[in-house]
Amino acid sequence: MVGGGGVGGGLLENANPLIYQRSGERPVTAGEEDEQVPDSIDAREIFDLIRSINDPEHPLTLEELNVVEQVRVQVSDPESTVAVAFTPTIPHCSMATLIGLSIKVKLLRSLPQRFKMDVHITPGTHASEHAVNKQLADKERVAAALENTHLLEVVNQCLSARS
């Protein structure tokens, strides 16, 4: 580990992560702008919501680190479900729960309440995958985490636009 500072400050676990190219912005269609036409939520819309979340350790987005990809987002608008699998940059990433919590909070703040969300680690990509997924799936733990003012501040930093 080397010194450095991301959102949480402190030491970096992955000092030299691979950086991926951002995908292009999705063009808005006339149908999407028409308020009279029902607009279902799809995987690209969810990806657009989470792609710019800041990594807690690096001055990069989750998309730039390939932590989130559109292919790992599943949506069923009729069933009101969203599933997002995310891949930490290293198998022992201690920030995995914070990253998952940031994704979950972004979705909670952005989507209609009818949606049920499943935010989880991509299978086989993290040493503590089961424990992290269990925490992220536990509504009471998530609510308690968001009552912690310091943790909420860190999540909000991950969700804020970088200048």
From Swiss-Prot:
Disulfide bonds: none annotated. Pfam families: FeS_assembly_P (PF01883). It is found in: Nucleus; Cytoplasm, Cytoskeleton, Spindle; Midbody. One of its GO terms (cellular component) is MMXD complex. The keyword NAD does not apply. Keywords: Chromosome partition, Cytoplasm, Cytoskeleton, Nucleus. One of its GO terms (biological process) is chromosome segregation. Component of the CIA complex. Component of the MMXD complex, which includes CIAO1, ERCC2, CIAO2B, MMS19 and SLC25A5. Interacts with CIAO1, ERCC2 and MMS19; the interactions are direct. Interacts with KIF4A; the interaction facilitates the transfer of Fe-S clusters to KIF4A to ensure proper localization of KIF4A to the mitotic machinery. Interacts with CCDC117; the interaction is direct. PANTHER family: CYTOSOLIC IRON-SULFUR ASSEMBLY COMPONENT 2B (PTHR12377:SF0), CYTOSOLIC IRON-SULFUR ASSEMBLY COMPONENT 2B-RELATED (PTHR12377). Component of the cytosolic iron-sulfur protein assembly (CIA) complex, a multiprotein complex that mediates the incorporation of iron-sulfur cluster into extramitochondrial Fe/S proteins. As a CIA complex component and in collaboration with CIAO1 and MMS19, binds to and facilitates the assembly of most cytosolic-nuclear Fe/S proteins. As part of the mitotic spindle-associated MMXD complex it plays a role in chromosome segregation, probably by facilitating iron-sulfur cluster assembly into ERCC2/XPD. Belongs to the MIP18 family. This is Cytosolic iron-sulfur assembly component 2B. It comes from Homo sapiens (Human). The gene is CIAO2B.
